[in-house]
């Protein structure tokens, strides 16, 4: 089931998850909806509260969307505490993931499991381009080191 991602929906899920998992300790960040095809969520620690962005390009179910929001909430939590590695997936991040898993039974991945892009956001690759890629691929593997050296020398 595909969920419609809106700022209001993400805000309501943030408030519910904040109350349940973080005892309402996180201030409400600015909520944005983006069109990222390589990341499902993003937290930027700027300003007083930061910005939480969720991509609308993926086919989310309720559990996956909650995992993405919680993942970004962990970054927000660490950033609010003043952790220097708040925006990375270091020890403090994994400690919070473990705490959430132990207390609530939810597994939070540091890199999201493979999620499907919605069809309208998939790049349409023409058939001739796909054929050319598979025909020329062995040559690209052989020539790549030489291209690197060529770029260094010239």
Q: Each PLM stretch: what is its role?
A:
Residues 67-79:
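Active-site recognition of the HExxH zinc-binding catalytic motif
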Residues 2-64, 80-154:
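Metalloprotease/metallohydrolase-associated module, dominated by Zn2+-dependent proteases
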